[in-house]
Amino acid sequence: MDLPRGLVVAWALSLWPGFTDTFNMDTRKPRVIPGSRTAFFGYTVQQHDISGNKWLVVGAPLETNGYQKTGDVYKCPVIHGNCTKLNLGRVTLSNVSERKDNMRLGLSLATNPKDNSFLACSPLWSHECGSSYYTTGMCSRVNSNFRFSKTVAPALQRCQTYMDIVIVLDGSNSIYPWVEVQHFLINILKKFYIGPGQIQVGVVQYGEDVVHEFHLNDYRSVKDVVEAASHIEQRGGTETRTAFGIEFARSEAFQKGGRKGAKKVMIVITDGESHDSPDLEKVIQQSERDNVTRYAVAVLGYYNRRGINPETFLNEIKYIASDPDDKHFFNVTDEAALKDIVDALGDRIFSLEGTNKNETSFGLEMSQTGFSSHVVEDGVLLGAVGAYDWNGAVLKETSAGKVIPLRESYLKEFPEELKNHGAYLGYTVTSVVSSRQGRVYVAGAPRFNHTGKVILFTMHNNRSLTIHQAMRGQQIGSYFGSEITSVDIDGDGVTDVLLVGAPMYFNEGRERGKVYVYELRQNLFVYNGTLKDSHSYQNARFGSSIASVRDLNQDSYNDVVVGAPLEDNHAGAIYIFHGFRGSILKTPKQRITASELATGLQYFGCSIHGQLDLNEDGLIDLAVGALGNAVILWSRPVVQINASLHFEPSKINIFHRDCKRSGRDATCLAAFLCFTPIFLAPHFQTTTVGIRYNATMDERRYTPRAHLDEGGDRFTNRAVLLSSGQELCERINFHVLDTADYVKPVTFSVEYSLEDPDHGPMLDDGWPTTLRVSVPFWNGCNEDEHCVPDLVLDARSDLPTAMEYCQRVLRKPAQDCSAYTLSFDTTVFIIESTRQRVAVEATLENRGENAYSTVLNISQSANLQFASLIQKEDSDGSIECVNEERRLQKQVCNVSYPFFRAKAKVAFRLDFEFSKSIFLHHLEIELAAGSDSNERDSTKEDNVAPLRFHLKYEADVLFTRSSSLSHYEVKPNSSLERYDGIGPPFSCIFRIQNLGLFPIHGMMMKITIPIATRSGNRLLKLRDFLTDEANTSCNIWGNSTEYRPTPVEEDLRRAPQLNHSNSDVVSINCNIRLVPNQEINFHLLGNLWLRSLKALKYKSMKIMVNAALQRQFHSPFIFREEDPSRQIVFEISKQEDWQVPIWIIVGSTLGGLLLLALLVLALWKLGFFRSARRRREPGLDPTPKVLE
């Protein structure tokens, strides 16, 4: 059946690394098989199948057999019962002097699934060669019935002491004393390394006849041979038939007990010339033909005792000895002196080589073959870490023989200059299969150049190698390559992934370990990351064991298990990684710790194997080794639960109330919840599984819109029993009452799980266990339920244009305003200094069908803050903003939720405040309307109302000035000494203060100071210019001009006012930036130039210091006052010292007298002097009274 899209998505997400962390290995009921901890029972484990009977093969490399710690292998039943030791430690290799103590049998195990046999190796098995013990290693092959079948020891070489030595003693009467000969014989025998695979000795004695004292194979130890030699008595005889004795030894002694391939050595001891000397030539020739090396010892006691010249005797003995004589011929003065040549004779014999010299004679003696093992089609690969001076090698044992690559075969990747590093090649061996190259062998060398290396190669019968690829480790001491595993993910017979362990990788202060992943691409393995551990910062040795196991989770892909035996304070843990589509998911699906399984487990995970179904339930089980224990983990069947949900009817029609619930009209519906279990393993196709589900209505709402008819208001919990492959459906009745929100669908959520998760099947860790399906409301539009609205949005602001500002604020006539706006763009709007807000009048109208979930999106530029939205009273709907935080640059408002009716209209006003922290040259407000309904593209253009303005701000500045000097009178007696030789000082201040809301910039203060007349007479000296703002930059021009020190005569009576138009000036330009409420003071400090002011001709004059504010061309600010400027006036007056000429005085006097005379005459003519007499009356007494 088709799966809902949600299930597929959830399943795909679960396959993503880290999405889940559960798995189907049962940790509640493991089988823990105990063994000896001192023997390290559990160091290696292998699952074994014998005719359908399942066993566990467990290695115990420190197991004892008798008095020797040989190691051994156990077979253990998987269900119940005790383990049985196979006593492989008692297996003896014939014809060698072996040493089995500490040979570590069971250190490596390899099973052969073709014939159900397995190989158990003892890499430290050694054998005696002379005075040395060679640790060549040995493996034992065990058949399907747990019976030893053969030994495998490809590195075993014949010793240098592999010799058959026959001692030919002259026992004639002339030998005296015999006891000295016996002492010599015993001493030389003690020098020999007698034993299997080494020297064996036979003794013949001759005189007139020849007899066997003992044959070559009679005794197998020095002790026995010495004991036998001590009982040899002198046979006697009157003749010395040396040729006969040599021929007897050649033809009979070497045949009876002689070994094929052994070096034949003959030691002839005689004290006189032979009586059959004519036969010597033939006898010696036959000995040469049989490759018998002859040592001849001449005892001169008989000749010395009788004073006979021994020259002829010595020549005969030298003829008997092999060439050269100096190495094979000895002579002693008498029988007692034989003891003196024992050491020399022994050294010369042992200088012989037991086999022909070849390249491997001295390269494999310490090879430790079997340190690792791997079964291939035609035999077995064995790692030999000690071969070639511990650089290591890989040997191959087949039914046709053995293949031992030459040392030179490895030089390409293991150069001669690094031979002393001890690479340990063969520490682990495995193989991969590619479609082009077939089977390729893989071997690890964890100590190569201290970082480790892995090589991929093929081996040829001519003892050469072809190395196809090499991989090198990253970190010194990480032991990269100590564990290697190839993985065929999809089971097609071709390797997909090669995993390389570096268990000692040091990270964050701990030996955490690392496992590298290499994927096969075009016949090369390419690095593709690493597997992840638990991120627990501890010494874990993650990657100490890596096992490719068959499909554990029943998804048809093989999996990987990695051991970390030192995790959790050496308790140990394993990690299970799933295979998926040709690769390995790098996050573990399950981490199993030793503490979950049993108490006291240590080094859990040191070995892992998982290829068989051990309990006959159709599932692959795991075998894991630990210190003194072997643990079997059982797999649980995996089930996938397919869930689906549908509704009848398919939509909620709130306009059709078809039932009553709680006395109210309601819309009734039914949900059908269906489950189908799918067991992944074929063995479980008739199994049942119990699940429990929880169903919830409108789970994310505080008050649900739908209600269940039975059980809880919005929850139901039920248990059901499902049969494999069969669908079971549950009916859940529910109803919907009146609700304000019938736009968003009602969500039905289902969660389900196993009824008994601790037993039986387990839910697939990559399969969803939740289901969410929604049932929509019917929208009430036309028959196709497709609503087509037509939203129209209109908006305008209250900002004035430049023309409107000129007419309304500046109150200028239209003609003057036209000239005023010429300097502005037509899109410029003016922000008055008193304005703090911007208002937008807007309307939203729906000219089409119902618009569901209509929203109004309001956005503004950063220099505005949303203040409020006020709806007009005559609106047909409502509008509510859901986020009115002032700092947000966007607001979302719901319009008549849940739907905006057809032909409805809503009017509203928006207010925005200017930001006090952000200043921009422009202003943007955008209103956009939209809905969940599908409006036609042709009508969407008017859904947006953008308002964009280029701004000019009215600067609100206070511009003032002050001065310490406004008037000065120049007097004739004014002294320069009072003013330091210059003149009276002055201090002027121009002050600008920003009273507005916005920071002001793009303005310039321009100050002009008349400093001299056009004739070069200095008027004043500007001593200093200061501002109280460090970031205000000013430029000063004209203050450095040098004027004449002595003023010249100049009449200024016609120029009562001196300014920049008729004087030389100092100009100061300053760029101004003012934040709100900031002020800047410009200080002018100087002195009047009194020397010139006294010399110039004037009565009174004014020196005008002018300061003007100017806006720069691109400044966003304007001034309400045209060209604002301020002046400071220095009014200078002067007193004159006049001298009147004499003629003026005389003329003035005479003129005054003449004027007086004319005045008197005129008065006389007018009767001025007669008027008093004419006014007297006739009757009056003219005579005055007399005082008596």
Curated annotation (Swiss-Prot):
Binding residue positions for Ca(2+) 1: 488, 490, 492, 496
Note the Pfam families from the entry.
Answer: FG-GAP, Integrin_A_Ig_1, Integrin_A_Ig_2, VWA
Per UniProt, subcellular location reads as:
Membrane
The molecular function terms in GO held by this entry are:
collagen binding; collagen binding involved in cell-matrix adhesion; collagen receptor activity; integrin binding; metal ion binding
Please list the residue ranges that the record places on the Cytoplasmic side of the membrane: 1165-1188
Query: Mind telling me which SMART domains this protein's record contains?
Result: Int_alpha, VWA
Topological domain ranges for the Extracellular compartment: 23-1141
Membrane-spanning residues: 1142-1164
Repeat: present as a keyword of the record?
Answer: yes
Q: Which residues form the signal peptide?
A: 1-22
Q: Where is the VWFA domain?
A: 164-345
Cellular component GO terms, alphabetical = external side of plasma membrane; focal adhesion; integrin alpha11-beta1 complex; integrin complex; membrane; plasma membrane
* UniProt binding sites for Ca(2+) 3: 613, 615, 617, 621
FG-GAP repeat start and end residues: 24-85, 91-151, 355-406, 411-461, 462-527, 528-586, 590-650
A single Gene Ontology biological process assigned to it is:
integrin-mediated signaling pathway
Q: How does it sit in the membrane?
A: Single-pass type I membrane protein
In terms of InterPro entries, this protein maps to:
FG-GAP (IPR013517), Int_alpha_beta-p (IPR013519), Integrin_alpha (IPR000413), Integrin_alpha_Ig-like_1 (IPR013649), Integrin_alpha_Ig-like_2 (IPR048285), Integrin_alpha_N (IPR028994), Integrin_dom_sf (IPR032695), VWF_A (IPR002035)
Q: What is known of its domains?
A: The integrin I-domain (insert) is a VWFA domain. Integrins with I-domains do not undergo protease cleavage.
Query: Record's PANTHER family?
Result: INTEGRIN ALPHA, INTEGRIN ALPHA-11
This chain's protein is named Integrin alpha-11
What organism does this protein naturally occur in? Homo sapiens
Lineage, broadest ranks: Eukaryota, Metazoa, Chordata, Craniata, Vertebrata
